[in-house]
Swiss-Prot record:
Residue positions binding NADP(+): 151-166
Protein name: Coenzyme A disulfide reductase
Other remarks on this protein: Reduction of disulfides occurs by a thiol-disulfide exchange reaction, but involves only a single catalytic cysteine residue that forms a stable mixed disulfide with CoA during catalysis.
NCBIfam families: CoA_CoA_reduc, PRK13512.1
Gene3D superfamilies per UniProt: FAD/NAD(P)-binding domain (3.50.50.60)
Keyword Aminoacyl-tRNA synthetase tagged: no
Function: Catalyzes specifically the NADPH-dependent reduction of coenzyme A disulfide.
Gene: cdr
InterPro entries for this protein: CoA_disulphide_reductase, CoA_disulphide_reductase_staph, FAD-bd_OxRdtase, FAD/NAD-bd_sf, FAD/NAD-binding_dom, FAD/NAD-linked_Rdtase_dimer_sf, Pyr_nucl-diS_OxRdtase_dimer
């Protein structure tokens, strides 16, 4: 019987195991998960903290026992893989509850260990990060047990912004600090102005170019010299791939610790695959490396690996587009394609407009700021970004499909919109981007 070992039981690992079982009823599948829970909805954790999502079962939908019963897949939580012997095809596992070590053999090994939260290194009972359900429970219980009223959020990436909004929704007084002037780095920085506008309109204090110097009990001392008391501190200062244990093997990593994979999610070592936040791949539409630690990529990787193991070798991964979106109070910010700083690899032009999301005479019309970058040599799309209160997601999704299909900026004029006054214009914003580009 073929033995398949999966490292990690969250989005990538659990989904991959489930997809393998769908196509393969016979192999023995075992998942080793170093933490307490499996298959939690990590994208939903901030909303659970904010009581927007009230039911625990909605963010923690399945247990190892149920997974075993329904899918005949063994999940061992609190079991951490600490080493890989790719010559003998074994992994070394430690039971984190008993400290017992043992070896397990595999025919196929799938690495989906995810990423870990970076830490500022301060030793305090008041400081938390948010990466898993255990972190979520700790934050939730701390707020209740200590009747926390005043929170500090450190960092201004999309997770920090979601945490801030949800702490505010829960009734806490929140302050945001960030060590640079660049926030939400997946967006064009000038389009992030709505973030500051939303903070200002709610009188939420924020300071850029600010850092923590020390934490003593409730008292936080900042680089600026300001000292202030907080009941709870949430760090959101980036992540790193959980790949330290992979260094024991011959699996190739890049200089940042990401696992290199091909279009089948194979590593350089036979019978070892990787997916999720731990990998580096390429963009789909341009020849540049890409790390996209988001849910879509993990789920796509799970499907491709399962198909590969089932013998369907023609199903491959064609690369990332990096499509991303975040809600911040009344606004939505989204982008697709390469990062702004990667545009320097190309000769490019930019087209933008700021227009109502649907017919102006129909109630509820709000503006969307839409921006598209294209390569002036072949006129293919490189990047797009949008911000607004409504209609942002569908424009970015359409432009994602356009990039996937290698459409030119001019061909956006041919996009046939689903038009009625409550939804769009006869010439949609995406069409207008194409028309505006004709003279460029």
């Amino acid at each position: 019987m073929r033995k398949i070992i999966v490292v990690g039981a969250v989005a990538g690992g659990a989904t991959c195991a489930s997809q393998i079982r769908r196509l393969d009823k016979d192999s023995e599948i075992t998942i080793f998960e170093k933490d307490r829970d499996m298959s939690f909805a990590n994208c939903g954790l901030p909303y659970f903290i904010g009581n927007i999502v009230n039911e625990r079962k909605d963010v923690l939908p399945i247990t190892p026992d149920v997974f075993k019963e329904k899918k005949d897949i063994t999940v061992k939580t609190y079991h951490e893989v600490i080493a890989i012997n790719d010559k003998d095809q074994t992994v070394t596992v430690v039971n984190r509850q008993t400290n017992e070590k043992f070896e397990a053999s595999y025919d196929k090994l799938i690495l989906s260990p995810g990423a870990g939260a970076n830490s500022l290194g301060f030793d305090s009972d008041y400081i938390f990060t948010l990466r898993n359900m255990e972190d979520t429970d700790a934050i939730d219980q701390f707020i209740d047990q200590h009747q926390a009223k005043k929170a500090l959020v450190v960092g201004a990436g999309y997770i920090s912004l979601e945490v801030l909004e949800n702490l505010y929704a829960r009734g806490l007084d929140v302050t945001l600090i960030h060590r640079s002037e660049k926030v939400n780095k997946l967006m064009d920085q000038d389009m992030n102005q709505v973030i500051f506008d939303e903070l200002d309109s709610r009188h939420i204090p924020y300071r850029l170019n600010e850092e923590i110097v020390s934490v003593k009990d409730h008292l936080v001392t900042f680089k600026s010299g300001i000292q202030e008391d907080f009941d709870i501190i949430i760090e959101g200062v980036g992540t790193h791939p959980h790949s330290k244990f992979i260094e024991s093997s011959n699996v190739a990593l890049d200089d940042k610790g990401f696992v290199k994979v091909n279009d089948k999610f194979e590593t350089n070592i036979p019978n070892i695959y990787a997916l999720g936040d731990v990998i580096t791949s390429t963009y789909r539409h341009v020849n540049l490396p890409a790390q996209v630690p988001l849910a879509w990529g993990a789920h796509r990787g799970a499907s491709v690996i399962a198909e590969q193991l089932a013998g369907n070798k023609n199903i491959i991964f064609k690369g990332f587009l990096g499509t991303n979106i975040v809600k911040f109070f009344d606004y939505t910010l989204a982008s697709v394609g390469i990062k702004v700083e990667e545009l320097t690899h190309f000769d490019y032009q930019m087209v933008e407009l700021n227009s109502g999301t649907h017919a102006g005479y129909y109630p509820g019309n709000t503006n969307v700021h839409l921006r598209v970058y294209f390569d002036t040599n072949n006129r293919h799309l490189l990047r797009a970004a949008a911000v607004g209160k409504t209609g942002v997601d569908k424009r970015i999704d359409v432009l994602s499909m356009a990039m996937m299909s290698e459409l030119t900026i001019d061909e956006l004029t041919e996009f046939e919109v689903a038009y009625a006054p409550p939804y769009s214009h006869p010439k949609d914003l995406v069409n207008m981007i194409g028309y505006k580009a004709r003279d460029l």
